[in-house]
């Protein structure tokens, strides 16, 4: 199986890559600057996405994990915070970057036959559970959830399944030291969810440990 993971330089993405390699799968991991085993991909830049697609050429992609994301508005105040450039950068990464990556790799996904797309969103995407704050990140992850649901509808006739996942509150640079679980537990759970993703599950919004999460 050929697995492509965006945002694989650290945290959950890096752990997913390590585990898939340990299982004997072929992994193409990406990072903004590349280097080492990573291929350069800045999902904010359409030309970078196009270059990455050209790098893959005609190679089939069995599983695409859209993991690249940012959370720059943590701790911002409603009065005077959340500047416009922060909105633009976050949506360019967390939403547009996901779409452009999927769009550019459609030929590779189609070549695999029965490919799967996993979009890493967040529990903060939920419209049902909205406690306030982190407006930019919440809005971007809600948009990514909506994007994934609609991709699932459009790609279903081609047999490409799409799942959207909350990876847990994970001890990473983004999640912080007070988070509930480590990257190992998150990656193990996510891999189990990706393995279970099929056409009956397409469009699902699930947590790393298998629970359905409210939209």
In which residue ranges do the predicted regions lie?
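Rossmann-fold scaffold of SDR-type NAD(P)-dependent oxidoreductases
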Residues: 6, 61-71, 94, 119, ...
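N-terminal Rossmann NAD(P)H-binding glycine-rich loop of SDR-like oxidoreductase domains
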Residues: 9-18
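Conserved glycine-rich Rossmann-like NAD(P)H-binding loop of the short-chain dehydrogenase/reductase
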Residues: 22-36
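Rossmann-fold cofactor-recognition segment
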Residues: 34-47
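Conserved Rossmann-fold cofactor-binding substructure of NAD(P)-dependent oxidoreductases
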Residues: 44-59
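Conserved mid-core alpha-helix of short-chain dehydrogenase/reductase
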Residues: 48-51, 97-104
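Catalytic loop of short-chain dehydrogenase/reductase
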Residues: 70-71, 78-91, 96, 100, ...
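C-terminal helical subdomain
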Residues: 164-167, 176-215
């Amino acid at each position: 199986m050929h697995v492509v993971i965006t945002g694989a330089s650290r945290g959950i993405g890096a752990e997913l890559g390590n585990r898939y390699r340990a299982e004997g799968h072929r992994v193409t991991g990406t990072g903004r600057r590349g280097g080492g085993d990573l291929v350069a991909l800045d999902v904010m830049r359409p030309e970078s996405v196009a270059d990455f697609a050209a790098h893959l050429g005609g190679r089939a992609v069995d599983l695409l994990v859209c993991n690249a994301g940012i959370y720059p508005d943590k701790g911002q105040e409603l009065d005077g915070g959340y500047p416009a450039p922060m909105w633009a950068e976050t949506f360019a990464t967390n939403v547009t970057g996901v779409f452009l990556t999927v769009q550019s790799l459609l030929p590779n996904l189609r070549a695999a036959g029965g490919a799967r797309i996993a979009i890493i969103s967040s529990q903060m995407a939920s419209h049902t559970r909205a406690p306030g704050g982190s407006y930019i990140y919440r809005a971007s992850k809600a948009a990514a959830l909506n994007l994934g649901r609609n991709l699932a509808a459009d790609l279903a006739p081609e047999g490409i399944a799409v799942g959207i996942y909350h990876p847990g509150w994970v001890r990473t640079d983004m999640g912080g030291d007070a988070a509930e679980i480590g990257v190992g537990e998150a990656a193990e759970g996510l891999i189990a969810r990706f393995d279970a993703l099929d056409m009956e599950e397409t469009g699902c919004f699930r947590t790393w440990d298998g629970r359905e999460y409210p939209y």
